[in-house]
């Protein structure tokens, strides 16, 4: 800037600044190659639902093809192991779909035989009562994929006469409290429910200012918007890998209306859980 004799301030042209702006504009200009890479990446990140048995893609949302009255969703390794041991072991379940996901944290597997250490998102219904559905999701669903997941699973106009139960875990350091987290007895359960969920939850409600994250939050928000009765049981733990004590912290939920009729033999299920943990330890041991 420069000042005239009359005190007027005028701008002097600066070629350096202009050149920098031009270089910045050139850098921001998208090339056809950039657009193609972006299209391919977006295509790769699309959430797809398909039948592994037939390798066919589902053309409609999962719940349009398989209407349900109860939908139980386990998200994360410990919640998945809980359903595998205590619910899926108590009845004959049939796979009805599988989500294919690709993102920075997850590559879902297409194999028919899944282990607890693999990333997968599989849907089942109960053979004796197909209106009861279950989802085991051990993989990470990125923020830009959550809406796609909801659309592919629930559809654009979901049924309101169903009840959704969500099980998941968070590390105890995410729990906000006036107490020291070291004084908390972990693991422990907290619940969060939609306005239309009228049953009393089997643990205390999650207090403010605590919030839920990722896919569990997306599912609960979706149910709240569409007035679907839904409850989220959130287990706070200090062990995020597959852990027997964390898995058993979900046991109070077995008394809920959604799960009570699905569980037959808890002692036998506990033994199956212990075998599952042993198998996982063997698979995780680099020396075997």
Curated annotation (Swiss-Prot):
Subunit field text: Forms a heterodimer with PSMG2. The PSMG1-PSMG2 heterodimer interacts directly with the PSMA5 and PSMA7 proteasome alpha subunits.
Record protein name field: Proteasome assembly chaperone 1
InterPro entries cross-referenced by the UniProt entry: Proteasome_assmbl_chp_1 (IPR016565)
Protein family membership: Belongs to the PSMG1 family.
N6-acetyllysine PTM sites in chain numbering: 264
UniProt entry tagged with the keyword Endoplasmic reticulum: yes
Biological role: Chaperone protein which promotes assembly of the 20S proteasome as part of a heterodimer with PSMG2. The PSMG1-PSMG2 heterodimer binds to the PSMA5 and PSMA7 proteasome subunits, promotes assembly of the proteasome alpha subunits into the heteroheptameric alpha ring and prevents alpha ring dimerization.
Pfam families xrefs: PAC1 (PF16094)
Record's keyword terms, sorted: Acetylation, Chaperone, Cytoplasm, Endoplasmic reticulum, Phosphoprotein
Protein's cellular compartments: Cytoplasm; Endoplasmic reticulum
Modified residues (Phosphoserine): 180
Species the sequence originates in: Bos taurus (Bovine)
Gene Ontology BP annotations: chaperone-mediated protein complex assembly; proteasome core complex assembly
Listed Basic and acidic residues bias regions: 28-38
Residues with the Phosphothreonine modification: 18, 54
